[in-house]
Amino acid sequence: NIEFVSANPTGPMHVGHSRGAIFGDVLANLLIFNGNQVTKEYYINDYGNQIINFAESVFYRLKEIKYKEKFPNRVNLYPGDYVIDIAKNILTGHPKIDLNNFQKIFKLLSEESLKHSMNLIKADLKALGMSHDNFVSEKSLVEKKLVETAIENLKEKNFVTEGYLNPPKGEENKDWKKTKRLIFKSTLFEDDTD
């Protein structure tokens, strides 16, 4: 598998995503041309804070459209016009949506927002002449506990250890806190450090 692009599904692609998309697609095509079996994969980062913030942005756009409430000026929200389009689509499909409680409609908002956003991304990829064989959802991996299973497999093979990492090089480290974490033993595979 070659996983490439994998832009967060919180809006349309930008030039930076396109660069990675082109590089990944060319690499995959070169490998295929040389007789390798390749699966082109897109990892959908649809789990975590960014998705919560994205759904919340749509929530506030819905309130703006339906009740003329001002969209909040918060750094964690997505202010783009595409969020307005998503909100309008949701209102078309769910005209009686209850906007009194974000938590109650989070699942609907996140699913509809992700679907809309992934359609934009797939259209952009198609315009670049690219297609992926697999689209893998992070959320589905988490819900199926595949990450925990992988970690257990690594532990059984003694490929991981608990330990501490040094602060990142070349960065201000005033906020760095040494915390115990699971570390992959990459030195077993001739890397310089774990």
Kindly give the residue locations of the regions a language model identified.
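NTP-dependent nucleotidyl-transfer catalytic core
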Residues: 1-194
